[in-house]
Amino acid sequence: MPLLLLLLLLPSPLHPHPICEVSKVASHLEVNCDKRNLTALPPDLPKDTTILHLSENLLYTFSLATLMPYTRLTQLNLDRCELTKLQVDGTLPVLGTLDLSHNQLQSLPLLGQTLPALTVLDVSFNRLTSLPLGALRGLGELQELYLKGNELKTLPPGLLTPTPKLEKLSLANNNLTELPAGLLNGLENLDTLLLQENSLYTIPKGFFGSHLLPFAFLHGNPWLCNCEILYFRRWLQDNAENVYVWKQGVDVKAMTSNVASVQCDNSDKFPVYKYPGKGCPTLGDEGDTDLYDYYPEEDTEGDKVRATRTVVKFPTKAHTTPWGLFYSWSTASLDSQMPSSLHPTQESTKEQTTFPPRWTPNFTLHMESITFSKTPKSTTEPTPSPTTSEPVPEPAPNMTTLEPTPSPTTPEPTSEPAPSPTTPEPTSEPAPSPTTPEPTSEPAPSPTTPEPTPIPTIATSPTILVSATSLITPKSTFLTTTKPVSLLESTKKTIPELDQPPKLRGVLQGHLESSRNDPFLHPDFCCLLPLGFYVLGLFWLLFASVVLILLLSWVGHVKPQALDSGQGAALTTATQTTHLELQRGRQVTVPRAWLLFLRGSLPTFRSSLFLWVRPNGRVGPLVAGRRPSALSQGRGQDLLSTVSIRYSGHSL
């Protein structure tokens, strides 16, 4: 019998003690197998495990395929397991966190197909020396990547392109000497960047882009302060509150910013953000090394005028309307625009180009229009004057000629005053110089549809032919010159009359004439109308003031008289009799001796006597300190008129 009891107390071999600890928090089943000296995955794990800890074991090699039966697994910790190889086969569709830190991995396997839902990947403190270009392909949900404490020297461009949702990136404690310029491109959610304790000496231009980066750790690098560091210096100056020093075990939100921790290695630990940059190009110099924000470099040659060879064709007569400064410019190659013979109906290519207006001293011609359009048909063909190889200069005031340099790349034209327009020098090939027809037209109260023959123009140098309208004479005089002239701010847009049908022009002209004859639209009437309203308002204000003054003066004379006539009658006829009742059943006796001195008729009573009935039953006059009632306004006068009884706290 005792032996039987002993056998019952011994542990049953059918129910062995479990190797791992199992706990359940809410709906998550957590299995802890840490420090069990395991060399493989235990076989008796619950199938609904969501969190599995296998830290500090001796796994060496681990295959993710062994975890496929655990379809609800969301977190796997394999840190400090002496792993040298991780086999990725099978699929864990819901695994979100994988910790592989403090192992012996020399390469990072491709995890995209096996772990499509991975959000946190920690490969810190391994032996990684490089990363393949597609190491993170397929990890589109990744939010945190930790590569701290490896042996990385370079990173492939586009490494982080497959991870647009990345929020935290740790590359600290590596051997990085440089960073790809577009490493952070597309990472709109990135808020923490750890680059401390590397071998970085500079940051490429545009590296940070438009990222705010609330937490940046950049200390512990041998920053080389020279002209190439100016972009990084400017970024540090504008983000000084976002640069921190890493402290192990401290939350980044509890740290204090310290931009001075980023120091020059070649300037006796001088802070990079204070580097003066002496002798380096400044804003406007070549390179624009001090720019940032995507920090994109700006084009500083925007104010230079590029010399282009242009052929200009325009009608000899056009209807000009002041619609502002518009230019319809034809920019084409001289070789393509100069055939052996130009057809009169040749069309020009339209392209918008804007030239800054400039003032030309001693120049009385106003550049009214510059336009290029389709050549309209002509009804009257003006006969152009024949010209020779030398163009006949038109009589004109002094003009400023622009002589652009012959280089086709952004030369800057210089303005030289000349007493008169010069003639372009012909090239070795004989070419007809531009003619100067002077068609005379009516001052155009009613626009017609002239269709002059276009003048074939061939330029022999990079020049621009400009149509200038003179305002000296009422006639429209068009001067054609091969020298570019300065444009005034009062330039107007030219609309060819071909665009307006004759019927439409007649209707518009009729409306214009009727509007001129309308008396209500006359400018003098429009100016007199508000003046009339103003005078009418003044008269109305004056009339109202006089009426108000008369009313006030009448009220002042009438009111005192009414008061004087009514007050005497009220005083002579006012009589009052007061009946009092003692609510508490106590009579008040007035000694008759008080009225013995009266003889004859009774006088007019004008005063009152108040008797105070106290809570103890005593009756007496009003004592000092008590407020008189409204009936005692006339006390202290001749005789007694009425007797009022006052209880304690009441007035009758």
Swiss-Prot record:
Residues 17-47 form the LRRNT domain. Glycocalicin is the product of a proteolytic cleavage/shedding, catalyzed by ADAM17, which releases most of the extracellular domain. Binding sites for vWF and thrombin are in this part of the protein. Changing G249 to S/V: Increased binding to vWF. It is a single-pass type I membrane protein. Disulfide bonds join C20-C33, C225-C264, C227-C280. Residues 17-531 are extracellular. It comes from the Eukaryota. Glycans are attached at residues 37, 175, 308, 316, 320-321, 328, 331, 340-341, 345, 353-354, 360, 364, 369, 371, 373, 379-380, 383, 385, 387-389, 400-401, 405, 453, 457, 460-461, 463, 467, 469, 473, 477, 480-482, 486, 490-491, 494. The modification Sulfotyrosine is found at Y292, Y294, Y295. GO terms for cellular component: cell surface; external side of plasma membrane; extracellular exosome; extracellular matrix; extracellular space; glycoprotein Ib-IX-V complex; membrane; plasma membrane. The record marks G506, V507 as: Cleavage. Two GP-Ib beta are disulfide-linked to one GP-Ib alpha. GP-IX is complexed with the GP-Ib heterodimer via a non covalent linkage. Interacts with FLNB. Interacts with FLNA (via filamin repeats 4, 9, 12, 17, 19, 21, and 23). (Microbial infection) Interacts with Staphylococcus aureus protein SSL5. Platelet activation apparently involves disruption of the macromolecular complex of GP-Ib with the platelet glycoprotein IX (GP-IX) and dissociation of GP-Ib from the actin-binding protein. This is Platelet glycoprotein Ib alpha chain. It comes from Homo sapiens (Human).
